[in-house]
């Protein structure tokens, strides 16, 4: 009888898991709001949580702003969480609605398949290393005591972290963003108090490298919640130059008996965790450095080879450290300095100034000879095709880059949707700098600034016209020629047999997030490919067929070009069907952010007191 009762108590239902996660979200958001001073202290009441054996601050709906935040949580976030659509909740405090971030609290959710015998969790090592590991545990081993312990630990760690940060600025904006699992979330789904988020709105912008910390995770068998924090209000800020290596995990338990300082928290021997900067100098009593601080010589050699190849492919004879950081954002500052020292020893570089180098390409015998592209009068048809494709790729790159404020390798590579390698994208950006479309100076986080002038505007209009003509010609050939005609086949091969939505010219016109309404079933996934062409696309693993979607009204310059013309023409065109693996990245943001100013808050409190 006693054993049966213990077994019954140990069972965790899906409803229990959902309620625990919901309560954890409430506790976390309310404590963030209280400790970071987002609302006056009188807006909070003390509340005891028996399940977690701790007291918390509960936010009360004292005015429209506090009520709005509660509605976001109780009616919006919970709706997406209950339906298992929610992938990430971003609780953001920024300078203004579309301005730079101050702090970001990222709550990630996963829904393990508890029908099986195991729950798997993939862990990726932070920094420049690419190692990862998978840990598996039996689902029945997750007990209520383990859940309670993990939840308490995560909340205490979060509270301890926030108390070490600097005070919030007087003027700030509070908002939430939701990211979804695209394979299960309907395209037209929007939770209450949220609206569809544009592509540029889904990306948070930082003016400086934030401090990054992993607070912890809670596995409640049916739901796994993980929390990460970013903040620019680090009192120990050293500009966070090691942004890639500064990801600190606050929930790692150590078997070693490490010494604790006054700034560290030691709640118990079973639940010890450390709040300390990972500056690479912390050692245990045994004098050994942690595994994350070790270096991988093979990986360093790979990174050095990539940087060396990129330097040799450039036409300029000078090099700035900032150029390397912009073109290789995944490499930390320390690693870049090590690579520069290696290239100095190899003779490829010569030091000009403190952070400037001159390039000696001939002095490096290990670097393979890279031919520069030269436009020649007499070229063979094959070379002419290559040059034509290169010009077309450059036009596509300009088409996506010119409307931007800042362009980076990662951003442009994503816009081109895999049509060009990252090395090719770097060369395209260098060409834009030489042609005067992009400034040579760079911001490490944002990239290189795009020059907006009459010349660039005219160039953008030129490119639009050229691409429209190319699309019209491609569509005329696709609709008039038979699938088996050699002329059609030759034409498509010259255009690399693109799928129908790209029209052999422009891959992914506009933002993926603006194409969120599918056509009716008879017209869904219409493609201009047929027979042999469709099978050719399917065999190419690097390119996913793109279905044609009904585009809603578009305001941005990047996503609003060519959409309606292509779509109207495709509506009447015949062709075979191909599958679509939901390539869009759906996201939501709040309909009305909370704009906070201290003066307005004081006036509201005075009115309520009266």
From Swiss-Prot:
It is found in: Chromosome; Chromosome, Centromere; Nucleus. Expressed in anthers and ovules. Residues 15-229 form the HORMA domain. Residues 522-535 have a biased composition (Polar residues). The gene is PAIR2. This is Meiosis-specific protein PAIR2. PROSITE patterns: HORMA (PS50815). Keywords: Centromere, Chromosome, Meiosis, Nucleus. GO terms for biological process: homologous chromosome pairing at meiosis; megasporogenesis; microsporogenesis. Disruption phenotype: Failure of the pairing of homologous chromosomes during meiosis (asynapsis or non-homologous synapsis) in both male and female gametophytes. SUPFAM superfamilies: The spindle assembly checkpoint protein mad2. Its main location: nucleus. It comes from the Eukaryota.
């Amino acid at each position: 009888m006693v054993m049966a009762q213990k077994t019954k108590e140990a069972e965790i239902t899906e409803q229990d898991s959902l309620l625990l996660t919901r309560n954890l979200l409430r506790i976390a958001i309310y404590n963030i709001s209280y400790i970071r001073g987002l609302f006056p202290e009188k807006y909070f009441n003390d509340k005891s949580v028996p399940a977690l054996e701790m007291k918390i601050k509960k936010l009360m709906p004292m005015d429209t702003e506090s009520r709005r935040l509660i509605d976001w949580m109780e009616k919006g976030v919970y709706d997406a969480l209950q339906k298992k659509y929610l992938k990430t909740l971003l609780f953001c405090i920024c300078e203004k609605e579309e301005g730079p971030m101050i702090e970001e609290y990222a709550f990630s959710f996963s829904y393990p398949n508890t029908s099986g015998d195991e729950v798997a969790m993939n862990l990726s090592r932070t920094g420049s290393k690419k190692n990862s590991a998978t840990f598996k545990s039996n689902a029945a081993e997750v007990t209520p005591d383990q859940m309670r312990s993990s939840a308490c630990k995560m909340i205490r760690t979060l509270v301890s972290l926030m108390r070490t940060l600097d005070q919030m600025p007087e003027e700030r904006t509070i908002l939430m963003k939701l990211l979804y699992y695209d394979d299960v979330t309907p395209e037209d789904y929007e939770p209450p108090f949220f609206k569809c988020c544009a592509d540029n709105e889904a990306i948070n912008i930082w003016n400086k490298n934030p401090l990054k910390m992993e607070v912890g995770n809670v596995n409640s068998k049916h739901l796994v919640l993980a929390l990460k924090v970013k903040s620019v209000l680090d009192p120990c800020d050293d500009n966070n130059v090691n942004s890639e290596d500064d990801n600190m995990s606050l929930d790692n338990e150590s078997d070693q008996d490490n010494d604790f300082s006054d700034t560290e928290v030691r709640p118990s021997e079973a639940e010890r965790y450390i709040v300390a900067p990972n500056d690479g100098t912390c050692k245990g009593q045994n004098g050994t450095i942690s595994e994350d601080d070790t270096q991988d010589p093979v990986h360093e050699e790979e990174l050095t080879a990539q940087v060396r190849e990129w330097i040799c492919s450039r036409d300029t004879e000078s090099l700035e450290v900032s150029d390397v950081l912009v073109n290789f954002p995944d490499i930390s500052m320390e690693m870049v300095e090590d690579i520069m020292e290696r290239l100095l020893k190899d003779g490829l570089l010569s030091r000009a100034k403190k952070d400037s180098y001159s390039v000696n390409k001939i002095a490096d015998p290990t670097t393979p000879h890279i031919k520069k592209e030269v436009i020649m009068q007499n070229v063979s048809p094959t070379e002419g095709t290559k040059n034509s494709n290169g010009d077309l790729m450059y036009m596509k790159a300009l088409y996506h880059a010119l409307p931007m404020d800042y362009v980076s390798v990662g951003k442009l590579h994503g816009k081109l949707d895999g049509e060009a390698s990252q090395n090719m994208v770097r060369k395209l950006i260098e060409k834009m700098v030489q042609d005067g479309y992009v400034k040579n100076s760079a911001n490490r986080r944002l990239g290189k600034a795009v020059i907006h002038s009459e010349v660039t505007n005219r160039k953008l209009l030129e490119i639009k016209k050229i691409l429209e003509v190319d699309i019209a010609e491609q569509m005329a050939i696709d609709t008039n020629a038979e699938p088996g005609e050699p002329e059609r086949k030759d034409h498509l091969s010259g255009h690399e047999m693109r799928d129908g939505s790209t029209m052999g010219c422009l891959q992914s016109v506009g933002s993926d997030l603006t194409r969120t309404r599918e056509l009716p079933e008879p017209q869904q996934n219409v493609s201009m490919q047929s027979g042999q062409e469709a099978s050719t696309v399917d065999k190419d693993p690097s390119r996913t067929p793109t279905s044609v979607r009904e585009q809603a009204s578009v305001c941005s310059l990047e996503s609003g070009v060519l959409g309606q013309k292509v779509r109207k023409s495709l509506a009447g065109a015949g062709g075979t069907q191909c599958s679509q693996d939901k390539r869009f990245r759906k996201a939501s943001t709040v309909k009305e952010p909370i704009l906070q100013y201290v003066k307005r808050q004081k006036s509201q409190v005075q009115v309520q007191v009266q």
